[in-house]
Amino acid sequence: MTILFLTMVISYFGCMKAAPMKEANVRGQGSLAYPGVRTHGTLESVNGPKAGSRGLTSLADTFEHVIEELLDEDQKVRPSEENNKDADLYTSRVMLSSQVPLEPPLLFLLEEYKNYLDAANMSMRVRRHSDPTRRGELSVCDSISEWVTAADKKTAVDMSGGTVTVLEKVPVSKGQLKQYFYETKCNPMGYTKEGCRGIDKRHWNSQCRTTQSYVRALTMDSKKRIGWRFIRIDTSCVCTLTIKRGR
């Protein structure tokens, strides 16, 4: 699990700035940007065959340290929900890339890894009981998440309520990159398309509905003015209830 997650995190490092890291005491020579990462040769060729396993463990520990630093930084910069009603303006669901991203946004992976670390500190018995699948837990509404492009969205609604055109490509110093949006919406083919799961239909009318949040994207308004604006995209699937009358 840890190695798989580290592999996904490595693919993101080329698209983001490195977060401040504390110095790590890692053995070996030639370490540069990241402690424990070498620019030439393999772990076995430098310190012998037995050094490979030690180096792999050290590398895993180093990346765990980096991830913990990123989680700490995220907690510091994330606005308080009690003092900021526009907290979902800061969701990280937009990526500029030359190809379709293969994984969810990095912050989603960090949250999953944080939950994994919390579970790792539990006893085996507590861990089994904390696993939602073992407890038979199911989502109230079935949802799907996927990356979409501006070619799929075409237009969107900005914070002023106006309709703007979402630009498919963003100019950069070495060419152009496509805008990708990570959207979450209710699954039309799921088991909850006729109502929320676990709701007493004798007393309640229920419906799974897709809700939206604001993210920043490069757009063009009706006056052909191009700029970065906050637009609404699908970000979750929630259950809405209304009580049945006349019963």
UniProtKB/Swiss-Prot annotation:
The propeptide sits at 19-128
**Cleavable signal peptide:** 1-18
Its GO CC terms are: axon; dendrite; extracellular space; synaptic vesicle
Where in or outside the cell it occurs: the entry states: Secreted
Q: What InterPro entries has UniProt attached to this entry?
A: Brain-der_neurotrophic_factor, Cystine-knot_cytokine, Nerve_growth_factor-like, Nerve_growth_factor-rel, Nerve_growth_factor_CS
One of the GO biological process terms:
nerve development
Pfam families, from UniProt?
A: NGF (PF00243)
Outline the subunit composition: Monomers and homodimers. Binds to NTRK2/TRKB. Can form heterodimers with other neurotrophin family members, such as NTF3 and NTF4 (in vitro), but the physiological relevance of this is not clear. BDNF precursor form: interacts with the heterodimer formed by NGFR and SORCS2. Mature BDNF has much lower affinity for the heterodimer formed by NGFR and SORCS2.
Question: What is the name attached to this protein's record?
Answer: Neurotrophic factor BDNF precursor form
**Species for this entry:** Ursus arctos (Brown bear)
